[in-house]
Amino acid sequence: MRFAIAYYKNNLAGRNIIEQFKKLFFSPQIPIIELNKETIYSDDIDEKNYPELKNIDFLIFASTHKSKKGEPSLSLHSAGNWRSADLGGKPGKICRTSAFVLKYLFQKLEENAKNNKEIYEKYNITLEATHHGPFINIPNCFIELGSQENEWRDEKAAEVIAETISSLQNFDKKNYNWTPCIAIGGTHYCPNFNKIQLNSNYAISHIIPQYNFPVIEIMIKEAEEKTIENIENVLIDWKGCGKSEDRQKVLDLLEKTGLKYERTDRTEK
């Protein structure tokens, strides 16, 4: 797969990840874009402003992860805003992404972390729900190191992420017969979807968490249209949809749109 990496030059984790990537896997065939502003506000990323992105299939943003709890984490997620644009991007607009690339990267992130006992015991490897900017046309995702300065400077953790990014050189979607889907419900860190992304045949692209409820039709349409693969299936975190009436509204919408659904608690994982 032809991919590129982008990072903000003043972002500690992004810079650390890129340094490890260059040490281990640097290739002139993989463009590395150094941004002069934070990734989430870089809506100007396109072939016109960055000619090296011509013929690129996918863009990976390497960045910091921040959280109130400050737990060490290696995380992966799609970009976009289901509602307001408090952290870059556009309100109600999400980016294009690939369910297959996200599944592949998440499995590799888990695998590479497991190869380093210290990292695997310290860091939480997790998906995140779709959130924040930028809003660009190139299919993309974020891979992040967090959640505090000690972690942002952790070279071993950054190396795990660099290895994961590099593995995309060997990715060919023709080799996989996964079922692409979007996911609805649950918390921001998606424990039920994590298990499915790792262990089932489902490949998740965009995630609409419970805190972005109520789900409306345009959100589902956005998720469908902004997934490279053809979406016919939706995963539902059954207990992560609030009250029964909230869940029923989701089911009614899916029936209206003609999408099939599967409950996470009834999915092999």
Where in this protein do the model-derived segments appear?
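N-terminal catalytic or cofactor-binding beta/alpha core of small enzyme domains
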Residues: 1-137, 148, 155-159, 166-191, ...
